Amino acid sequence: MTQHSQSILGARVMALAIDFILLETIHLLFFILLADKLIQVTHFDALALLTFLILFLFVFSVSFLFLHMAYFTFFHAWSGQTIGKMIMGIRVVTNDNKFISPSVAFLRWSGYILSFVPLAIGFLWAVVDKDHCAWHDRLAQTRVIST
Protein backbone atom coordinates (compact mmCIF):
# COMPACT_ATOMS: atom_id res chain seq x y z
CA MET A 1 0.00 0.00 0.00
CA THR A 2 1.45 3.36 -0.99
CA GLN A 3 1.75 6.28 1.42
CA HIS A 4 -0.93 8.16 -0.56
CA SER A 5 -3.43 5.28 -0.46
CA GLN A 6 -2.75 4.79 3.26
CA SER A 7 -3.49 8.47 3.90
CA ILE A 8 -6.77 8.29 1.94
CA LEU A 9 -7.77 5.12 3.79
CA GLY A 10 -7.01 6.80 7.13
CA ALA A 11 -8.90 9.92 6.02
CA ARG A 12 -11.90 7.76 5.07
CA VAL A 13 -11.97 6.17 8.52
CA MET A 14 -11.69 9.56 10.24
CA ALA A 15 -14.34 11.12 7.96
CA LEU A 16 -16.77 8.30 8.74
CA ALA A 17 -16.09 8.69 12.47
CA ILE A 18 -16.73 12.45 12.26
CA ASP A 19 -19.96 11.88 10.33
CA PHE A 20 -21.21 9.25 12.79
CA ILE A 21 -20.40 11.41 15.82
CA LEU A 22 -22.26 14.33 14.22
CA LEU A 23 -25.27 12.25 13.19
CA GLU A 24 -25.57 10.37 16.44
CA THR A 25 -25.32 13.57 18.48
CA ILE A 26 -28.28 14.97 16.53
CA HIS A 27 -30.11 11.64 16.76
CA LEU A 28 -29.51 11.32 20.50
CA LEU A 29 -30.65 14.88 21.26
CA PHE A 30 -33.86 14.27 19.33
CA PHE A 31 -34.54 11.09 21.26
CA ILE A 32 -33.74 12.62 24.64
CA LEU A 33 -36.52 15.10 23.94
CA LEU A 34 -38.79 12.27 22.78
CA ALA A 35 -37.98 10.16 25.85
CA ASP A 36 -38.88 13.08 28.11
CA LYS A 37 -42.27 13.34 26.40
CA LEU A 38 -42.67 9.56 26.64
CA ILE A 39 -42.24 9.66 30.41
CA GLN A 40 -44.75 12.52 30.69
CA VAL A 41 -47.34 10.66 28.61
CA THR A 42 -47.05 7.27 30.33
CA HIS A 43 -46.88 8.54 33.93
CA PHE A 44 -44.78 5.42 34.64
CA ASP A 45 -47.70 3.04 34.01
CA ALA A 46 -45.84 -0.25 33.39
CA LEU A 47 -47.90 -1.49 30.41
CA ALA A 48 -48.03 1.91 28.76
CA LEU A 49 -44.31 2.37 29.36
CA LEU A 50 -43.52 -1.03 27.81
CA THR A 51 -45.72 -0.28 24.80
CA PHE A 52 -44.15 3.11 24.28
CA LEU A 53 -40.67 1.67 24.82
CA ILE A 54 -41.20 -0.84 22.01
CA LEU A 55 -42.55 1.92 19.79
CA PHE A 56 -39.67 4.16 20.83
CA LEU A 57 -37.06 1.54 19.86
CA PHE A 58 -38.77 0.96 16.52
CA VAL A 59 -38.91 4.68 15.74
CA PHE A 60 -35.31 5.07 16.94
CA SER A 61 -34.12 2.33 14.56
CA VAL A 62 -36.09 3.57 11.57
CA SER A 63 -35.04 7.17 12.15
CA PHE A 64 -31.41 6.05 12.46
CA LEU A 65 -31.57 4.51 8.99
CA PHE A 66 -33.49 7.43 7.50
CA LEU A 67 -31.20 10.09 8.99
CA HIS A 68 -28.08 8.32 7.73
CA MET A 69 -29.61 7.65 4.31
CA ALA A 70 -30.68 11.28 3.90
CA TYR A 71 -27.35 12.67 5.14
CA PHE A 72 -25.03 10.50 3.05
CA THR A 73 -27.22 10.56 -0.07
CA PHE A 74 -27.72 14.34 0.03
CA PHE A 75 -24.11 15.32 0.72
CA HIS A 76 -22.58 12.83 -1.70
CA ALA A 77 -24.98 13.87 -4.49
CA TRP A 78 -24.58 17.58 -3.71
CA SER A 79 -20.80 17.85 -3.50
CA GLY A 80 -19.29 14.39 -3.25
CA GLN A 81 -18.39 15.22 0.34
CA THR A 82 -20.02 14.77 3.71
CA ILE A 83 -18.97 17.11 6.51
CA GLY A 84 -16.43 14.51 7.63
CA LYS A 85 -15.01 14.22 4.12
CA MET A 86 -14.82 18.03 3.84
CA ILE A 87 -12.81 18.18 7.06
CA MET A 88 -10.53 15.34 5.93
CA GLY A 89 -10.04 16.69 2.40
CA ILE A 90 -11.48 13.78 0.43
CA ARG A 91 -14.33 13.40 -2.05
CA VAL A 92 -16.41 10.64 -3.66
CA VAL A 93 -16.40 10.55 -7.46
CA THR A 94 -17.40 8.07 -10.13
CA ASN A 95 -14.71 5.78 -11.49
CA ASP A 96 -14.26 8.28 -14.34
CA ASN A 97 -13.78 11.22 -11.89
CA LYS A 98 -17.24 12.82 -12.25
CA PHE A 99 -19.62 13.94 -9.52
CA ILE A 100 -22.08 11.26 -8.51
CA SER A 101 -25.81 11.52 -9.18
CA PRO A 102 -28.47 11.24 -6.45
CA SER A 103 -29.30 7.70 -7.59
CA VAL A 104 -25.64 6.65 -7.41
CA ALA A 105 -25.35 8.35 -4.00
CA PHE A 106 -28.36 6.34 -2.78
CA LEU A 107 -26.94 3.12 -4.24
CA ARG A 108 -23.65 3.85 -2.48
CA TRP A 109 -25.45 4.39 0.83
CA SER A 110 -27.37 1.13 0.30
CA GLY A 111 -23.98 -0.50 -0.14
CA TYR A 112 -23.02 0.75 3.34
CA ILE A 113 -25.62 -1.64 4.74
CA LEU A 114 -24.22 -4.51 2.67
CA SER A 115 -20.71 -3.56 3.77
CA PHE A 116 -21.67 -3.38 7.43
CA VAL A 117 -23.95 -6.39 7.94
CA PRO A 118 -21.36 -9.20 7.72
CA LEU A 119 -19.14 -7.94 10.57
CA ALA A 120 -18.19 -4.78 8.62
CA ILE A 121 -16.15 -6.92 6.23
CA GLY A 122 -17.26 -4.75 3.31
CA PHE A 123 -15.60 -1.71 4.89
CA LEU A 124 -12.47 -3.64 5.85
CA TRP A 125 -12.24 -4.87 2.26
CA ALA A 126 -10.76 -1.49 1.31
CA VAL A 127 -7.58 -2.47 3.16
CA VAL A 128 -6.92 -5.48 0.90
CA ASP A 129 -8.54 -4.29 -2.34
CA LYS A 130 -5.98 -3.33 -5.00
CA ASP A 131 -7.78 0.01 -5.55
CA HIS A 132 -8.65 0.38 -1.84
CA CYS A 133 -12.37 0.31 -2.62
CA ALA A 134 -14.93 -0.98 -0.13
CA TRP A 135 -17.94 -3.01 -1.23
CA HIS A 136 -20.15 0.08 -1.43
CA ASP A 137 -17.58 1.70 -3.76
CA ARG A 138 -17.64 -1.35 -6.03
CA LEU A 139 -21.44 -1.53 -6.00
CA ALA A 140 -21.87 2.14 -6.95
CA GLN A 141 -18.76 2.26 -9.16
CA THR A 142 -17.27 5.10 -7.12
CA ARG A 143 -13.97 5.85 -5.48
CA VAL A 144 -12.60 8.29 -2.93
CA ILE A 145 -9.96 10.83 -3.94
CA SER A 146 -8.05 13.63 -2.24
CA THR A 147 -9.37 17.13 -2.92
Residue locations for each model-derived region?
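Hydrophobic alpha-helical transmembrane segments and immediately flanking/interface helices
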Residues: L124-T147
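Short, small/hydrophobic-residue-rich motifs at membrane-helix boundaries and re-entrant hairpins
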Residues: M1-V117, S146-T147
